[in-house]
Amino acid sequence: MRTVLNILNFVLGGFATTLGWLLATLVSIVLIFTLPLTRSCWEITKLSLVPYGNEAIHVDELNPAGKNVLLNTGGTVLNIFWLIFFGWWLCLMHIATGIAQCISIIGIPVGIANFKIAAIALWPVGRRVVSVETAQAAREANARRRFE
């Protein structure tokens, strides 16, 4: 089912949103001051291309023992910079694509996936794209650690 939905996403606009993310990734590589944003751009590019079966999860959830104060502070600064220069137009791109996809009954699941990516597009630094199973296992392990 994931494969069918990913193909449907690609055909109904996922290709265009992925190109938008690739453009943002290339811009972040070319401009030296945006180089720290490249990893986040690439992670969300993968999610935009294949949204079903993958999930964007914060790195603190993947490795709670290795919490990095620099990532939290620096990540917030980078996210604010990202939001001002890149995030808003990528978010609008996903919202517009999601609305267009929700016009037809077949496109509704894909449109909902675009709305989820739109939220991530605003604040992507510190997120990694992993399989749904890995994200669920990380959340369960964190919950066990909290209650031990």
Swiss-Prot record:
The keyword Ligase does not apply. GO terms for cellular component: plasma membrane. It comes from the Bacteria. Residues 38-76, 126-148 are cytoplasmic. The chain crosses the membrane at residues 15-37, 77-99, 103-125. It is a multi-pass membrane protein. InterPro entries: Inner_membrane_protein (IPR052937), UCP028777 (IPR031308), YccF (IPR005185). Residues 1-14, 100-102 are periplasmic. It holds the Pfam family YccF. This is Inner membrane protein YccF. The lineage of its organism: Bacteria, Pseudomonadati, Pseudomonadota, Gammaproteobacteria, Enterobacterales.
